[in-house]
C-alpha cells in the first residue's frame, strides 16, 4: 500500500516511519502514559491506497485527540501533529506570508483584494528582519488540540479557503496591528501573547492588521428617538456594528407601549414586540464578520414598562410565532424600588414612557420620587402585585435562561462615568457598564489575563508581581487600540475618544486554584480571589495613570469619582488588603489623572479560553468530563487536573471514566477517590451558590465595570431563584445574573456505560495517600517568562520589605512593583486517625443556602405554593386540535395572590430577607432553606 507525499511522489507505507514521526513530537510529555506505537497502530488500520501524508497527519491527530481521556498529554500531542501538518502547508517566514496576504488577487474578479492593511504591510517590510527573527515557532506546539482547531476554524487568515497563517503569525499580526513601527512594543506584546499570559478578544484576533481593523467587542446603543426615523436609524447602527463582529446591548426603555397615541398619524402604537421582531431578523441576517459568529443583540428594558409581560415571553418555545423573537437576548435593568416592592409584597405600576417621561433618565432617590409622583397622579397603565411580575420573570428564566438581571441603581451609583449622565444598559454579556446616548454609542475593547500563567510552581504560590506587570502591558495595548480602531459608526468613535474605557478580564481562575491545590470554596481560594482582582485593579490604574502623565487624562475626566479620589472599592465601602500601596497610587492619580474612565470587566471568554486551554473566566468547572465538538467529530475530554491526579494515584481506568460519566461528570459519590481530591474537584453544581455570589461580591470591589456572572442550579424552583437574586442584590452586585444555567430533570440512558464495571469501581476503596501534593506544571506550561529588564519608569507602588515570589518580568516603561508575598500561608494540618498530617481542604460548612438545597416541587412552582394535580387531556380535545389561549387571554392566569401568604410564618420570610454578610443566615428561610 502506498502513501502520496506532498511533492506528488508515492512511497510505501512504513509503520516505523509513522511511529518515529509521532515520537519526535512527544518531547516533554509523560512517556509513561503516552504511547506513540498505539497511535500508529490505529492510524495504519485506517490507511487506504493513495492516502496523502497530510491526511495521515490528520488521522494521527484525531487518534491522539480521542486518547485524551487516557492522559491529558495526548491533547498536546494531537495539537503538535496537527500543527506540524499546518507548518508543512504554510510558509515559515512571516514577512513572506504578509506579502502574500497583501498581494492577494481575487480569482473571481481579478482585482487586488488585500487581506492586510497597506500601512501594516509597509511596516512589516520596513522591519521584516526584526519581526521574522522574533517569532518562536516552537510555541505553536504548546497548544492543546481543541484550542488549535478553534484557531484553524475562525482565527487564522485563509487564502482561497486554505489556511495561510500559523498561530505565531496571527499573534505577530495582532502585535504589529496594534503597535506598528514601535518594534519594542510589538515584540513585548508578541512574547506575552505567545507565552499564553494573556490574549486579546476575538474581534482583535480576527481583524488586527486587516484593511478594516474593527477590534472592539462590545457596543452599547441607545434608541435614537421614539419614532419611525429613530427606530430605523438605530436598526442601521446595529446592522453596521454586527457586520463588523460587534456584540450589541440596546436599551428600549423609552419606546412607547402598546396602545399609546401617535400624534403624527392619529393612530396607536403596536408596542415593542413588532419592533423587536425586526431587530431579531436583522440579528439573523447580519452575522458578525462573514459567518465567524452569528449576530447578537441583547435588549434591555426596565420593569415598569407597560409591555414588560410580553417582553418576558419573547424567547419562549410555545405560543404564537408572531409574538416571539427567539434570536434576541433579553435583559432587565432593575431599579431598587422594584426589588423593595417584591420584598414587601407591594403593588407595582406599569407605565408608558410616552405618558410618564423621564424614568429611564434618573436613578436612585430621584427615580423613586418621579415614579411615585406618576403613581399618585394616576398616570400608570396598570397596577399589579410586584410578585406577579416577579413570578413571570422567574418563569421566563426557568424556561429560557433569560432575562439577564442587572441592578440599575448599583450600576449607576458605583460607576466612574456617573458624571456623564444616567447609564441605561449593559452589553451583550452583562460585564460592560458604560454611558450611552442617542449621539453616543459606548464601546469597549477587551482582553483577558490567563490567571493560570502566573503560578509559581516551585514555591507553590501566586506571582502577583508578574501579574501586575503583564496587566500594565494589557492596559497599554487596549488604550492604543482606542486610537487605531476602525469604528463602524461615528457615534462609537466620538464616545470612545471622549471617555476611553477598556475592559481587562480574566480566564482560568479555577485552573489557578487547582494548580495551587485550593478547593474553589475554601478560605484560601476566597482570599486569592480578592488578591488577584485587587492586583489587576491596582496595576490597571497604575498603567492608566502613567499614560495620563504622558498623554493627559481622558476628555471627560473632571467631575468623575476618580478625579475626586474615589476608587471602586471606596464606592463599595471596602478596605483593600495591604498587598499594594494604594495611598501612593491615589496621590499620583490626583497629580496626573487617569487615561481611561473604566478598566476592569471580566467577560465570559468562551472562545479565547478554549484557545489557551483554560477554564472560562472566573467560573468553576461545570463537569469533570465533557464533549468537545470539532469538524472531525466529538471527543471526550476529562478535566486535565483531575486526570493527572487519578493517573498518579493509580485510579484511572476505563471503569473510572465510565463511572464519572454515569455520575454526570461528578466524582463526589465515587468511594475509591479520597475526600481531599473530591473537595478539590467539586463542579459548579456541587459548590454552594452562596459561595459563588459571595466571591463575585468580594472581587466586585475591584471591578469598575461589572462581571458576567452565571448562576447554576441543578433543580431550579421559584424559591431558590428568588433567594439567589435577593442575595446578589443585597450584596451590591451590579450584574445579578447573566444566564441561569440548569440541568435536565432526567438524565438520558447511558447505553455506552458498562454497569458491571461501575459496580467494580464501587467496590474499591480509596488508597492511602498523604494528602494533596504540590502540583508540578502541566506539559506546555511556560514556568519562566523573562523579557528585557526595566530600565526606567516611575517608582514601584507595592509595599517594600516583603519576601519575593518567582521570576520577574522586566517590561518597558512598566512600573515594576516590589515583590509580594504568596497569597496564603501553608494550610493548617489536621491529624488523621493514623497520625498522618492532612491539609485542611475546605472550611466548616455554614448553614445551608436555600438556593443550594434540593426541593421536590416542579421548577415552575414556588416553594410555598400548593402542588396542583394536573389531568391528562382527553382524546376528543386532541382530535379537535384546540389550541391554548394563553397568548389571547392575558388574564388567564392572574397570579395576583401573595405567593407567600399561605405559607407558614418561617416561609413568609423568603421575600423579606434582609440578608447581609453580618447576619445569621440560618434565621432566614431565603438563606437557610
From Swiss-Prot:
Classification of source organism: Eukaryota, Fungi, Dikarya, Ascomycota, Pezizomycotina
Species of origin: Neurospora crassa (strain ATCC 24698 / 74-OR23-1A / CBS 708.71 / DSM 1257 / FGSC 987)
Protein name: Ribonucleoside-diphosphate reductase large chain
Composition-biased stretches (Basic and acidic residues): 868-884
Description of activity control: Under complex allosteric control mediated by deoxynucleoside triphosphates and ATP binding to separate specificity and activation sites on the large subunit. The type of nucleotide bound at the specificity site determines substrate preference. It seems probable that ATP makes the enzyme reduce CDP and UDP, dGTP favors ADP reduction and dTTP favors GDP reduction. Stimulated by ATP and inhibited by dATP binding to the activity site.
GO biological process: deoxyribonucleotide biosynthetic process
Keywords: Allosteric enzyme, ATP-binding, Deoxyribonucleotide synthesis, Disulfide bond, Nucleotide-binding, Oxidoreductase
Active site per the UniProt annotation: 427, 429, 431
Residues that bind dTTP: 226-228, 243, 256, 263-264
Residues holding GDP: 202, 217, 427, 431, 605-608
Amino acid at each position: 500500500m502506498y502513501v502520496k507525499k506532498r511533492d506528488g511522489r508515492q512511497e510505501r507505507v512504513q509503520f516505523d516511519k509513522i511511529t518515529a514521526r509521532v515520537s519526535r513530537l512527544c518531547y516533554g510529555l509523560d512517556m509513561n502514559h503516552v504511547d506513540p506505537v498505539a497511535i500508529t497502530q490505529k492510524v495504519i488500520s485506517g490507511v487506504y491506497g493513495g492516502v496523502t501524508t497530510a491526511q495521515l497527519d490528520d488521522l494521527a491527530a484525531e487518534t491522539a485527540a480521542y486518547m485524551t481521556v487516557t492522559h491529558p498529554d495526548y491533547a498536546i500531542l494531537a495539537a503538535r501533529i496537527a500543527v506540524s501538518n499546518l507548518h508543512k502547508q504554510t510558509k515559515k517566514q512571516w514577512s513572506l506570508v504578509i506579502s502574500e496576504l497583501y498581494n492577494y488577487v481575487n480569482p473571481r474578479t481579478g482585482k487586488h483584494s488585500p487581506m492586510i492593511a497597506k500601512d501594516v504591510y509597509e511596516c512589516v517590510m520596513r522591519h521584516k528582519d526584526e519581526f521574522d527573527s522574533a517569532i518562536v515557532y516552537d510555541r505553536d506546539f504548546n497548544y492543546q488540540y481543541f484550542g488549535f482547531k478553534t484557531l484553524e476554524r475562525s482565527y487564522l487568515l485563509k487564502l482561497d479557503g486554505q489556511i495561510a497563517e500559523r498561530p505565531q503569525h496571527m499573534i505577530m499580526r495582532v502585535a504589529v496591528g496594534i503597535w506598528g513601527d514601535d518594534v519594542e512594543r510589538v515584540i513585548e506584546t508578541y512574547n506575552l501573547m505567545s507565552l499564553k499570559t494573556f490574549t486579546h478578544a476575538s474581534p482583535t484576533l480576527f481583524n488586527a492588521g486587516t484593511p478594516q481593523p474593527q477590534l472592539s467587542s462590545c457596543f452599547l446603543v441607545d434608541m435614537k428617538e421614539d419614532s419611525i426615523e429613530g427606530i430605523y436609524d438605530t436598526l442601521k447602527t446595529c446592522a453596521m456594528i454586527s457586520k463588523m463582529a460587534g456584540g450589541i446591548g440596546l436599551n428600549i426603555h423609552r419606546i412607547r407601549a402598546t396602545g399609546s397615541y401617535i400624534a403624527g398619524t392619529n393612530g396607536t402604537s403596536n408596542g415593542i414586540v413588532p419592533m423587536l421582531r425586526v431587530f431579531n431578523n436583522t440579528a439573523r441576517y447580519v452575522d458578525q464578520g462573514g459567518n465567524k459568529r452569528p449576530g447578537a443583540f441583547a435588549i434591555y428594558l426596565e420593569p415598569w414598562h407597560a409591555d414588560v409581560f410580553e417582553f418576558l415571553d419573547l424567547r419562549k418555545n410555545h405560543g404564537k410565532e408572531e409574538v416571539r423573537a427567539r434570536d434576541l437576548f433579553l435583559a432587565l435593568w432593575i431599579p431598587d424600588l422594584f426589588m423593595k416592592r417584591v420584598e414587601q409584597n407591594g403593588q407595582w405600576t406599569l407605565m408608558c414612557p410616552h405618558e410618564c417621561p423621564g424614568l429611564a433618565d434618573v436613578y436612585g432617590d430621584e427615580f423613586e420620587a418621579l415614579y411615585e409622583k406618576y403613581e399618585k397622579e394616576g398616570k400608570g397603565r396598570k397596577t399589579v402585585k410586584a410578585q406577579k411580575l416577579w413570578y413571570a420573570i422567574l418563569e421566563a428564566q426557568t424556561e429560557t435562561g433569560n432575562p439577564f438581571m442587572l441592578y440599575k441603581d448599583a450600576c449607576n451609583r458605583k460607576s466612574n462615568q456617573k458624571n456623564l449622565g444616567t447609564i441605561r444598559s449593559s452589553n451583550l454579556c452583562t460585564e460592560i457598564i458604560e454611558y450611552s446616548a442617542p449621539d453616543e454609542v459606548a464601546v469597549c475593547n477587551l482582553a483577558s489575563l490567563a490567571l493560570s500563567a502566573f503560578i509559581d510552581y516551585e514555591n507553590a504560590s501566586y506571582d502577583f508581581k508578574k501579574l501586575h506587570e503583564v496587566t500594565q502591558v494589557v492596559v497599554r495595548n487596549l488604550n492604543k487600540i482606542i486610537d487605531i480602531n476602525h469604528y463602524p459608526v461615528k457615534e462609537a468613535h466620538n464616545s470612545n475618544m471622549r471617555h476611553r474605557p477598556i475592559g481587562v478580564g480574566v480566564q482560568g481562575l479555577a485552573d489557578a486554584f487547582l494548580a495551587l491545590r485550593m478547593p474553589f470554596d475554601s478560605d484560601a481560594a476566597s482570599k486569592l480571589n480578592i488578591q488577584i482582582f485587587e492586583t489587576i485593579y491596582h496595576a490597571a490604574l497604575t498603567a492608566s495613570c502613567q499614560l495620563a502623565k504622558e498623554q493627559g487624562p481622558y476628555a471627560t475626566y473632571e467631575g468623575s469619582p476618580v478625579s475626586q479620589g474615589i476608587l471602586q472599592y471606596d464606592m463599595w465601602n471596602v478596605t483593600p488588603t495591604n498587598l499594594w500601596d494604594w495611598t501612593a497610587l491615589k496621590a499620583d492619580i490626583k497629580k496626573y489623572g487617569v487615561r481611561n474612565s473604566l478598566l476592569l470587566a471580566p467577560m465570559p471568554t468562551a472562545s479565547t479560553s478554549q484557545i489557551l486551554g483554560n477554564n472560562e473566566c472566573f467560573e468553576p468547572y461545570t463537569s469533570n468530563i465533557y464533549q468537545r465538538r470539532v469538524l472531525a467529530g466529538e471527543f471526550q475530554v476529562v478535566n486535565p487536573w483531575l486526570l493527572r491526579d487519578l493517573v498518579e494515584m493509580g485510579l484511572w481506568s476505563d471503569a473510572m471514566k465510565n463511572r464519572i460519566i454515569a455520575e454526570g461528570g461528578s466524582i463526589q459519590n465515587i468511594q475509591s477517590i479520597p475526600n481531599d481530591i473530591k473537595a478539590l474537584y467539586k463542579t459548579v453544581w456541587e459548590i454552594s451558590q452562596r459561595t459563588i455570589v459571595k466571591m463575585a461580591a468580594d472581587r466586585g470591589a475591584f471591578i469598575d465595570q461589572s462581571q458576567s456572572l452565571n448562576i447554576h442550579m441543578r433543580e431550579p424552583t421559584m424559591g431558590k431563584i428568588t433567594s439567589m437574586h435577593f442575595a446578589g442584590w443585597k450584596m451590591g452586585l451590579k450584574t445579578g445574573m447573566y444566564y441561569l444555567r440548569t440541568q435536565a430533570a432526567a438524565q438520558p440512558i447511558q447505553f455506552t456505560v458498562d454497569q458491571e464495571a461501575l459496580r467494580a469501581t464501587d467496590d474499591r476503596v480509596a488508597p492511602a495517600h498523604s494528602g494533596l501534593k504540590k502540583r508540578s506544571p502541566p506539559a506546555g506550561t511556560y514556568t519562566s517568562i523573562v523579557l528585557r529588564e526595566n530600565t526606567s519608569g516611575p517608582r514601584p507602588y507595592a509595599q517594600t520589605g516583603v519576601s519575593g515570589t518567582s521570576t520577574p518580568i522586566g517590561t518597558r516603561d512598566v512600573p515594576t512593583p516590589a515583590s509580594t508575598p504568596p497569597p496564603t500561608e501553608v494550610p493548617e494540618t489536621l491529624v488523621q486517625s493514623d497520625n498522618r498530617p492532612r491539609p485542611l481542604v475546605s472550611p466548616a460548612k455554614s448553614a445551608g443556602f436555600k438556593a443550594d438545597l434540593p426541593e421536590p416541587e416542579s421548577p415552575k412552582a414556588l416553594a410555598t405554593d400548593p402542588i396542583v394535580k394536573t389531568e391528562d387531556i382527553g382524546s376528543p380535545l386532541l382530535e379537535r386540535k384546540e389550541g391554548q389561549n394563553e397568548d389571547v387571554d392575558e388574564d388567564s392566569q392572574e397570579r395576583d395572590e401573595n405567593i407567600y401568604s399561605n405559607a407558614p410564618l418561617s416561609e413568609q420570610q423568603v421575600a423579606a430577607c434582609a440578608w447581609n454578610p453580618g447576619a445569621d443566615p440560618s434565621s432566614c428561610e431565603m438563606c437557610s432553606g
